[in-house]
Amino acid sequence: MAHELTVQELEKFSADFNKNPKNKVVARAAQRSGVLEASYNDRVQSELTRVFSTELDTDNVTNQKHSGRCWLFATLNVLRHEFGKKYKAKDFTFSQAYNFFWDKIERANMFYNRILDSADMPLDSRQVKTDLDFAGTDGGQFQMAAALVEKYGVVPSYAMPETFNTNDTTGFATALGDKLKKDALVLRKLKQEGKDDEIKKTREKFLSEVYQMTAIAVGEPPKKFDLEYRDDDKKYHLEKDLTPLEFLHKYLGGVDFDDYVVLTNAPDHEYDKLYGLPAEDNVSGSIRIKLLNVPMEYLTAASIAQLKDGEAVWFGNDVLRQMDRKTGYLDTNLYKLDDLFGVDLKMSKADRLKTGVGEVSHAMTLVGVDEDNGEVRQWKVENSWGDKSGAKGYYVMNNEWFNDYVYEVVVHKKYLTDKQKELAEGPITDLPAWDSLA
């Protein structure tokens, strides 16, 4: 039912506000320093520590800078922990630019696939509009990184260093997005006119142009490189003329992405069900995005078990909530906004997802956990925002934040129950691109 605000109502609102003298004190603090600073809970500093009962041997952090490549950084961070542990080279890093290059090409190909598949839909249909809205962007999921690594391998960071356009993807993403949207109109018209032969030639031309744009912005990937590093014992290692796939299979052959499952906690969806996100798959004919939705305690138990076995855990989360970038605190009580405004802002995890308040905005890596008599107190988190953020790039997260704002963890299937193992291999319920899990 429509309601029109009246002068009398507005005068009453003002009178109610001014009735309480504390409101003016709070208002001055908020207006001078911002609502987050004014509501900052100093007690968090004494409640979160940097000591963990289980902790991996960590190294220097990476820095995604002004890009949406957290999903790729977190995946390569998990792999570099494995490499560092196996070969005693904890400061060794993989090139994010290398896999980013191939993601641009593969994702463009998938975009053209979707545009052709939806050519009979109106241009303003939700499906087509969503595909167009995300053209050229660089956010992603764990399986997207896994698909790229499986198909193209990995290279050391020195073999394909970062460039201006990988550190700040804004300009390139805009240019690529514009091109893809322009191409979409051409491909839709050809499909609607039934010109299949012309579609094949045109798509190939468009993909060649995407390759050209990406090579100009990022640089062409190396076909071979020399593996050269000094391990933690200062011993020198050199192996010449490795291809990226040879490097992957020889040095990380024990990592099989098929052995890993993404457990998700989405209370707005049915539990014990395997969901897919086909609109986000980035490599045609490769690893699909699959999420097994289970109660939160299973994400906790599997993550702890994997950490205790010495393996890092990729996790998807909403880092934009209750986070202090400077200190690296992730705590549900960090900003007391309810107290500042005098209103109840609390929502359940399910309601946050339903309304778009909650989202998977970031991916990081779990590298430690602190338990006290079986109760989880806090987690150690490796971020990819450089060493000027948090404690030399590492964050500390209380368990309430984990429960409220973590939505996905990637764990080996050996940590699943028998029922969950069956579900992970079972039928997939595909979700649309606008679903809360997308």
From Swiss-Prot:
Optimum pH is 4.5. Its main location: cytoplasm. The active site is at C70, H362, N383. GO terms for cellular component: cytoplasm. One of its GO terms (biological process) is response to toxic substance. PROSITE patterns: THIOL_PROTEASE_CYS (PS00139), THIOL_PROTEASE_HIS (PS00639). InterPro entries: Papain-like_cys_pep_sf, Pept_cys_AS, Pept_his_AS, Peptidase_C1B. One of its GO terms (molecular function) is cysteine-type aminopeptidase activity. Its EC number is 3.4.22.-. Pfam families: Peptidase_C1_2. It is found in: Cytoplasm. Keywords: Aminopeptidase, Cytoplasm, Hydrolase, Protease, Thiol protease. It comes from the Bacteria. Optimum temperature is 32-37 degrees Celsius. Gene3D superfamilies: Cysteine proteinases. Can hydrolyze internal peptide bonds in Met-enkephalin and bradykinin; however, hydrolysis of alpha-, beta-, and kappa-caseins is not detected. Belongs to the peptidase C1 family. PANTHER family: BLEOMYCIN HYDROLASE (PTHR10363:SF2). This is Aminopeptidase E. The gene is pepE.
